[in-house]
Regions:
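Bacterial Sec-dependent N-terminal signal peptides
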Residues: 1-47
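Conserved functional hotspot residues or short segments at active or partner-binding sites
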Residues: 295-393
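Glycine-rich, charge-decorated loop segments at or immediately adjacent to ligand/cofactor-binding or catalytic sites
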Residues: 108-114, 183-204
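Short internal beta-strands
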Residues: 98-104
Length: 410
């Protein structure tokens, strides 16, 4: 099993040389890293090679061209054991980077979920950074004037409501409209080992779900881009001229601990694994731990019955005004839950049962996360998790047949 390690809170990446690690280094690694050590022990024989590392495959395409890059803080790789950003690497190689487009959370990845991101100039390179989150979500024709090629490199987490997919859609659409080639540097999907959840219905589509796919779809972002093209999901059925720089030694059933947290409130493997099941709470009066160090690993609220676990959200980078700020929440700690290989509704169902004011539990935007208006009704009507999941089966089977056409990796 291949692993892509992330050590939280700015601890350095542990480099393995010929799979030999000193006893001291291993002890230090265990001491400083609170993630499960199992993925480390199961580190595979073949190193995962991500798209950004395969410079020999994409450098020839960008020679002597005006380039725009769609990236954020995750767009990094290692050269001589040093972490370097894609933009810095391309500039160092003398390539002509005209501008950078940034998704939700910004180019540096430190803005709150939903926070409006403004255009800026990168202090390090002087390159203009154009925000694709806020009032503007799609590159304009003026933005792309004189641009000959775009590169997309952002780490996704494999959940439909993670907005990097919608940014990908609009970037592809703009490239198609302006006859610009797009190169996607593929990355692993840390939730790529299963497919589950209700398939998005048209009436519930929004920026947190633009396509008829389940909550967890089991594809890399490169495979997903091929599906956007192949299923004619771009405006007027346009096609983007697309090239995917593929991964090597990728096992979609493997565990991937990412070298950078993909957004401020997904700090580790556990939070990423729980995210598809817990994100539904974002449209309820229940906290998922924003404003704590256990984001998407705990749930709770102040007026739940007193429990053995409590937490108090506070203002912090990435969660400037968290739900229930400075209030003690009674809740559940999910950090020791088993690694999920399916979407779990048990916490959402239990949360609704615990709610004293049930008519105010589901907010108006819940159906946009759920992908339909049925899930809310099913929970209100007391259906069990197996009964609800049974209603997804036909749509999931149809999606799996569509998905199969675009898979690059076994």
């Amino acid at each position: 099993m291949i692993c892509y390690f992330y050590i939280s809170y700015n601890l350095e990446f542990l480099m393995l040389k010929n799979f030999q690690v000193s006893k001291y280094s291993l002890i230090q690694f265990i001491k400083i890293n609170f993630f499960l050590i199992v993925p480390f022990i199961l580190f595979g024989q073949n190193k995962l090679i991500v798209g950004i590392e395969k410079t020999d495959l994409y450098f020839p395409y960008i020679e002597n061209k005006n380039i725009a890059v769609v990236s954020n803080h995750t767009s990094k790789f290692y050269i001589n054991n040093k972490k370097i950003h894609l933009v810095d690497s391309l500039i160092n190689q003398g390539y002509n980077i005209q501008k950078v487009f940034a998704p939700e959370h910004g180019f540096r990845g430190n803005s709150d979920a939903g926070e409006k991101i403004i255009n800026s100039i990168d202090a390090k390179t002087g390159i203009p950074i154009i925000s694709l989150y806020g009032s503007k979500k799609k590159p304009s024709n003026a933005d792309l004037e004189n641009i000959e090629l775009m590169i997309f490199d952002i780490q996704d987490v494999g959940a439909r409501f993670y907005t990097y997919l919608s940014t990908l859609h609009y970037v592809m659409e703009s490239c198609a409209e302006n006859n610009i080639d797009l190169i996607i540097l593929d990355r692993p999907n840390p939730n790529g080992h299963y497919i589950d959840g209700p398939v998005m219905e048209k009436e519930s589509m929004s920026f947190v779900g633009m396509h008829p796919v389940p909550v967890v779809y089991g594809m890399t972002i490169g495979e997903y881009a091929l599906m956007i093209n192949g299923e004619n999901w771009l405006n007027n059925g346009q096609k983007c001229k697309l090239k995917v720089i593929e991964l090597s030694n990728y096992d979609r059933m493997g565990k991937y601990i990412l070298p950078e947290k993909p957004s401020p409130n997904l700090p580790n493997l556990k939070s990423i694994n729980l995210y598809p099941s817990l994100c539904f709470f974002e449209q309820t009066p229940v906290s998922v731990g924003r404003g704590t160090l256990n984001q998407f690993q705990v749930i709770g609220k102040p007026n739940w019955n007193k429990s053995n676990y409590q937490f108090k959200p506070i203002s912090m980078p990435g969660a400037k005004s968290p739900k229930f700020e400075n209030q003690t929440c009674n809740g559940i700690n999910l950090k020791n839950e088993k690694y999920l290989s399916e979407l779990s509704l048990k916490w959402l169902i239990q949360g609704y049962k615990n709610e004293k004011n049930k008519e105010k539990f589901f907010k108006s935007g819940f159906h946009k996360l759920a992908g339909n208006k049925k899930l809310e009704k099913q929970i209100k009507n007391g259906l069990s998790e197996p009964e609800i999941k049974k209603s997804w089966v036909d749509d999931l089977n149809k999606f799996k047949k569509i998905r199969e056409k675009y898979l690059i990796y076994n």
